[in-house]
Amino acid sequence: MPGTYAPVPNVYHLLDHLTFRSSVVIPNSNFVGRIWSDYWALQDNIVIRVSPEGAKDADYCHNSNISPILSPLKTITEYGTLHPTIDKDASERGYPSARMASSFFKLASCQARQVKIDPTRFLEFLLVTASSPRVPSGVDSDQPNPWLPETSPALQAIWQIMQRYKLNGNYYAPALVVNTGAVWWIPPPGRTNCVTVQFLITDLINLAVNAFATRLAPELEMCAVRVYLAAASTPNYAHALLDLKSIFPNLSLHSMYREGEFGGKCPRIEWTEPRSSYRFKWIGVTQLYEGLRPLTPSRDSKALLKMRDSGLEDVAKVIITMRRDHPRHTSDSVRFVRGVLSLISGMYLVRPPTMSVLREYSQTPQIEEPIPPDWWTGAVGNLSYFNDKAKGPLAHLYSVWLEAARQVVMDPSTHDPLTQAIYKTQFVTPRGGSSAALKQALVESKVELPDFSGTGVKRSSKIYQTAQLAHFSFQTLIPTIMGQVTLGIRNQVQRRARSIMPMSNPQQTVSVPHTLVANYINKHMNRSTTSGSAVQDKVIPLLLYASTPPRTVINVDIKACDASITYAAFLAPICGAMHQGFDLGDPSLPFMNVPSSTQYDRRNPAAPYNRPVSGLQTMTQHLARLYQAGFSYKVDDPFSSGNSFVFPTTTFPSGSTATSTEHTANNGAMADFFLREYVPQHAKSSTLKFIVKDMNIQNNYVCQGDDGMLIIPDLGTKRISPEDLAELMELLEKYGRGFGWVYDIDSSDSAEYLKLYALFGARIPNISRHPPVGKEYASPETGEIWPSLVNIAMGSFYNGVTDCLEWRDWLKFSWAFACFASRGSFHPKTGPRVDAQYPVWSFIYMGLPPILLPGQTPFLTSVYMPAGDQGIFAILHQWRDYLTARATSDYPPLKRRHPVWHLADVPSLLSDLGVYRGYWAAQVSRRPEPSPDDADPASVEAMSAALSTYLLKDPVLRDRVVRGTNAWRRLTDTHPGRLPSRVPSLLDVPTRWIKAGRDADKPRPSAVAMMMKDIQRAASSSRKDFSRLLELYLHVHVHLGPPVPLAVDPEVPHVAGADILNDDHWYKVTSLGPIAQSTKKYFDATLFVGKTVSGLDVEAVDATLLRMSILGAEPEEYHAFLAGIGMSDAEAHRIASAISLADAQIVQLARTVNLAVPSSWMSLDFDTLIRSHSYPRQPGISDSSTLVRERASWINSVLRLLCATVAMSRVGPVCQATVSSVDGGVNQIVGCLRAWMRDV
């Protein structure tokens, strides 16, 4: 397995052969280690990180010599881990000095571990990739990359640093990264091994890879090297990097076009109605002129001030001088901005969990205008309502939540058993959730939990917890609501590590009303977007729209948002408003099996009384009690032995399912009052009042969680004045202070939202957030199973495509990474070693385009090639003539005519080229599958029964599912072979949960060995065929015609890096234009069924419905299937009548045969490509094999997507694609696809 204790091949010797041309000076202070014990202290028997220099929040790994606390390894004596005596003294005897030494070792090792694999491997990949010039592709626009290893300041800095780590002619890396963390070099007496050097080398390797992949100028690369070296000479590298991270955006993105002759072009973008659809239109070009120059001053002085303290003033001046070469908005200027932003360190920052908790969860906001006691009515149980005296922003917040709660409780769908099942299953996942604390709370109540350990399901998972609690009534579980929550950690890039609170199931259950009402607010009252980790999930066109003049954008962020949502200012009014809103409902109704209850109502002090409240209100009562008391955070710090304590906090729990949607609802509601009431009442400027008069949160404020973007509209062609802009920002800051929010407000004539950036309508990929080397490892000791490295390599490649890295160079680098990742071995404790090797074609199947295939010119396949059968179809399609000719000349003809290759023995040729072996090996699961023999059948059955009880506790839902399943069985038995043999059902969900829970647990060695053998077996298989679907796709012949008309002006920058130097990205962007709609909204609109329970996939449900339609299902068959997934008769009838093959979207129909839009297309206008530039047959005289019968018109969508796949998989401009012919005729394909659908 990669990561066993073995020295990395001495890649540093390769640097000895380079003649460097830059002059990097490494300060001696980088190698002077501070005494580690000065940085730790004991406070109330808790080991804490301290800063003898008095630096604020400097909790990260300090620059100290680690060698005094090491003990040599038996296998490699030059390297060591924590001395066993120190480890024992810390863990068993609790000696303070040993606990501190152990904490230092674990913190340093965990920081070193935040990489995909040992960083020297990436140095190897880079040097191998850059060792020879790239094969020229013969295309005029293929410009050689000017980056050379000899001119790289980052590589020279690495070489100079490593001279300190050279002994007897051999180099020793400061640390070797292994699965469980790091092992550290033990230097000879008189030398030190300062931990920061390892982190610095990682950052320098990361920088060198980025510089190579972006054609970064050596001058800019040197700027980053200087900053990293300056940070490494401080006592605290990560803290210094955090302090300096703003300098690069301030000197580039936030300061562009402030001087010189401004000009250039940017897109004109319109946000079409209804705005909730997030559809945008590119309606031309704006010629930029002096009146549209950025309003806000440059941030140079701010950056210079910060850099002066670190002796980096000259670095800032280099960037400023280079920036002055770009006074106009062009593809070169946005490439420059992307280059400067890429200089920010991409390190995942680690800090001790204890310090995260003490810092993050002890904050209490300053509320300047607290709620007066006379605003409240008398108590109703644990909460109170606002009375008529309430006014101002919090009264508005109350009214928003009150109205939303009324709408929710009056909506019949809220009370549908399936809706309730969807909400109660949303937190049933393989992730953990305060299980130990929940168990403790029940033990104190003398409740014994059932044991399902024989199932092999991960014990800490929510799935296991759900099964344990399934048979208990809500009443029994009430004590657990106030139970402790346990510690979770997330390490982040360019942000401090944050601790998270995973809540237990009963706590999540009572949070559901909060989620329900917040979702309503965000859907109907706010203009909120979804947040996803992938760029494609976010609303890219919104950002581009906001950044184009004459609009002005203010980027808003709520500082310490979790801590700012206090009970006093927010949660008390919200709980009161929800409870009061739910008064409109039936007080006897339970909700999610929480029964109604009686609460003491003291609103009228003269006549208090007991009154019944509904299940929803009972949940709200418990939620109010929980929020009011705050949370007890149970901290067992894995870094510091003996750091086990309970920390009370009033901070909003980050692990609640309500967190994100709740923050978004409040963010929008407070912005609503600000625009409608606060600014008109408090603004001094009459023009500002005039501008704000027409602004509202539906059109001008978009938010997600604590992030917001205020879009100020234009006044005709004029923009808001700098004075009005400054006043508006000042008012917002003052407004927030009233209720305890600190708004971090920024306006720099660029748009920033959810960590995406745009400047004058051009997306600026934030490369440093996708570091080639870095990866988050949240657990201090975590092992990776080998094939996961293959997924990591592919993920890294896709990030480079999204970020528009130089595509040929990035492809070459990605293949170097893939070659390393392709081989793995496993050493069981008993028995022989197991090896596995992926063939080249496995990576092509996974989506990595080949650089050169026999008979073709280099770099012919685009990085926009989809993965899977689609990609293989596109490659074989453009390779078809060569394959046929070579098979005809080199192999005897086939005895039986092949439906695609006729008499040419192409299957034997493909087999000899290794295509089939790679194809099938890539489809073997890369996760070890737990063996059924490892589980106790009785235990599995008991757990399945418990999970079924939880899911189907509602008798109405249970009746629907049983009725639907029986009806489906009866109908399919009556007409066997007419409909799909297997369809999703709620009865399958418990089995799926158990499988997910078993997969989440650490795999047994036997399962790992079996997976490796399966991969190797597939990689050496003698099969000579593809999947049924791909064999059918290959019947289709696609003709590429002329290039599609340009969608956008090629001179307008749309994505930084997608320019003529990076030709394929440029051709794709100019051919199609940027994505014009929210991808989430687009794909949501392609679904008949919007939501389903956790454990079922809405896309699978949707594909099943369409397959049934294609196969001619009757209404009662739809009803039976939909009842089987829990739907009411009315909802089943509505959906069944909505299923129309004529109205279904193209991507929806293509999904029925496993075709999809790959993520790489989602930043482009793929819908127009599929709809308007892909043709299922030639207009006019078509080949008779392409003529489709009317009732099989759904096949046109499949053919369109195959055409689009061929067009996008070829480099260069996107061409119109047409199906020219179909071997055997399209109607034969239709019949075969129908047969496949019945078997799937």
Curated annotation (Swiss-Prot):
Compartments (UniProt record): Virion
Entry-linked Pfam families: RdRP_5
Bilayer-crossing regions: none
One Gene Ontology CC term in the entry: viral nucleocapsid
Stored InterPro entries: DNA/RNA_pol_sf (IPR043502), RdRP_5 (IPR012915), RNA-dir_pol_reovirus (IPR007097)
EC number: 2.7.7.48
PROSITE patterns recorded: RDRP_DSRNA_REO
Gene Ontology molecular functions: hydrolase activity; nucleotide binding; RNA binding; RNA-directed RNA polymerase activity
GO biological process, one term: viral genome replication
Primary localization: virion
Alphabetically ordered keywords of this record: Hydrolase, Nucleotide-binding, Nucleotidyltransferase, RNA-directed RNA polymerase, Transferase, Viral RNA replication, Virion
Purpose: RNA-directed RNA polymerase that is involved in transcription and genome replication. Following infection, it catalyzes the synthesis of fully conservative plus strands. After core assembly, which consists in recruitment of one capped plus-strand for each genomic segments and polymerase complexes, the polymerase switches mode and catalyzes the synthesis of complementary minus-strands.
Name recorded for this polypeptide: RNA-directed RNA polymerase VP2
Species per Swiss-Prot/TrEMBL record: Aquareovirus A (isolate Chum salmon/Japan/CSRV/1981)
